[in-house]
Design a protein with these regions (language model features):
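N-terminal Sec-pathway targeting helices
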Residues: 2-15
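Hydrophobic alpha-helical targeting segments used for export or membrane insertion
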Residues: 12-19, 402
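Periplasmic c-type cytochrome electron-transfer domains
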Residues: 25-510
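Hydrophobic alpha-helical membrane-insertion segments, chiefly the h-region
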Residues: 17-27
Length: 510
């Protein structure tokens, strides 16, 4: 095809190629060259969240306007970011001519963000613009890239992301901000400087152990070890063998209310303190100093914890529940033989739990536990977070609160089990391989995600499927390091499929 036979339209720098025979359609990019004021973002906020699922503590007596403002601040927080991507770089980029030029495909499927369909200014949850109408538009990311999930077409605020691919995004941004492409910003010295700074940060803070093995899994603790080590050793990276491999799924924010009772945070309870401040260390990847972490990031996260996070409650199961079957499941849940409550707590049916804070070894993959090494604890103790809490070795993973468990799939700390049906059944029946992008839909019968985005993939022989997709980042492979789907085997106590179905029905109510 000759250049004369095509015409291209640049959409967020993602070029759609149009010919007489084929049209790759694209949603128009919704932003002007200049940024918006805070007032402009506020004016569209109510319509932007009208379909967002966010449950608040009914005991929160603050006026609705105060809660709304807290939510707005959280969703547009930039933490005074040091790393920005200028909009002009997207507008002038033609790098993506060779790939699909549809905005929804790139942002939603490739990066795996949740599209913010009701927001006329921001395309996806977690993308935060600078709110300065007098400056050129630029972008950073915030907590919502990891703490928003799409289930059956609705966005769930506070849920752990099920599709975000941090490695894909980082790799794409490195290419987008390299010298070749930012050189196209002729006459935009400020934007070229922003792009150069972003490229420097992306390359300076890369370590092999912080690349997750599949999308929608976090290596935040390993990354925190790397960043704290660097600052304690004049910028030197820790050796590969000193950093653990511990891919985990992102936890839901609504578990915060339960975990406050024990003051032990994250999947292994290794951080002790009144706030889950280890999350702030991820800002170190954006080239923050320890001083900026202590004086800017930590105070903001404390404020967000008090104004938003501690007030979140789990979303209600959105489909009909068999009350009689759920009642039978409740009996089993609290029974002497099965006794889920002994580790997971007692529930009032209104989104609240008395959580015992049990952290125990039930035979699951140990890799994430081993991330918190003696070297990591020493690096933590040299950081400003040491005055906010303590990092310690843990004996096991948290018997996690089960509030909103229907939406917290896939299951176990590493997201290695796709449904409650598989989790509560024989370990030998857990699938070795399932497709991560299928997690945008709910399997209502088994409660969790479907195994395949395309049902035809289920017709492929298991050995062929493993050979074809086993190394694909869009598929979860339980044979990879740290990804084992073993442990939490309570089938000998549950015993029958009827009991399993009853337990699942009760779990929908929590």
């Amino acid at each position: 095809m000759s250049r004369a036979s095509m015409r291209s339209g640049c959409v967020w720098g993602l070029t759609a190629i149009l010919t007489g025979a084929v049209v790759i359609t694209a949603r128009p990019w919704r932003t002007p060259a200049a940024a918006w004021s805070r007032a402009a973002l506020t004016s569209t906020f109510d319509s932007g969240i009208r379909n967002l699922v966010a449950e608040w503590d009914p005991e929160d007596r603050r006026p609705a306007a105060v809660r709304r403002q807290a939510l707005f601040d959280f969703m547009y927080e930039t933490y005074d970011a040091s790393a920005w991507i200028p909009q002009s770089l997207f507008d002038t980029n033609v790098m993506t001519q060779a790939i699909v030029g549809d905005v929804d495909t790139i942002v939603g499927d490739k990066v795996g963000l949740v599209l913010w369909r009701d927001n006329p200014k921001v395309p996806a949850f977690g993308m935060a613009p600078n709110a300065d109408a007098d400056a050129p538009l630029r972008w950073t990311v915030n907590c919502l890239v990891c703490h928003t999930a799409e289930i059956d077409g609705r966005a769930y605020f506070g849920a752990g992301s099920k599709t975000f691919d941090e490695l894909w995004l980082g790799t794409a941004l490195k290419q987008l901000t390299n010298e070749r492409w930012r050189g196209r910003l002729a006459g935009r010295p400020e934007d070229r400087a922003l792009a150069a700074n972003a490229n420097r940060i992306l390359n300076a803070h890369h370590h092999d152990k912080i690349d997750s093995l599949s999308r929608a899994r976090s290596t935040a603790f390993a990354a925190s070890h790397v960043e704290m080590f660097m600052r304690a050793h004049d910028g030197a990276m820790p050796p590969i063998e000193a950093v653990g491999r511990g891919d985990v799924k992102t936890p839901p924010l609504w578990h915060t209310a339960a975990k406050m009772q024990a003051g032990r945070w994250y999947t292994d309870g290794s951080f002790h303190g009144p706030f889950p401040l280890m999350a702030s260390s991820m800002e170190l990847e954006k080239d923050r100093s320890f001083e900026a972490l202590a004086t800017i990031v930590v105070p903001k996260i404390k404020s967000e914890f008090e104004s938003v996070i501690r007030h979140l409650r789990p979303p209600r199961y959105p489909y009909p529940i068999d009350d009689a079957l759920a009642a039978r499941g409740r009996e089993l849940f609290y029974s002497q033989d099965i006794g889920c409550h002994r580790c997971h707590g007692t529930y009032d049916g209104r989104g609240n739990v008395q959580w015992p804070g049990v952290h125990v070894d039930v035979g699951t993959d140990r890799s994430r536990l081993d991330v918190v090494s003696t070297d990591f604890i020493a690096a933590f103790d040299a950081s400003p977070l040491a005055v906010e809490g303590s990092l310690v070795h843990s004996r096991g993973y948290a018997a996690t609160p089960l509030t909103g468990v229907w939406a917290n799939f896939p299951y176990l700390h590493n997201g290695s089990v796709p449904t409650l049906h598989h989790l509560l059944g024989p370990v030998s029946e857990r699938p070795r391989l399932f497709e991560i992008l299928a997690a945008r839909r709910l399997d209502r019968e088994r409660v969790g995600q479907p195994l395949y985005a395309d049902p035809r993939d289920g017709l492929i022989a298991p050995t062929e499927r493993l050979e074809r997709f086993g190394e694909n980042r869009d598929w979860f492979n339980s044979t990879r390091p740290g990804c084992a789907n073993i442990g939490h085997d309570f089938w000998p106590a549950i015993r029958t499929d009827a009991n399993r179905r009853a337990l699942i029905e009760y779990l929908k109510t929590l």
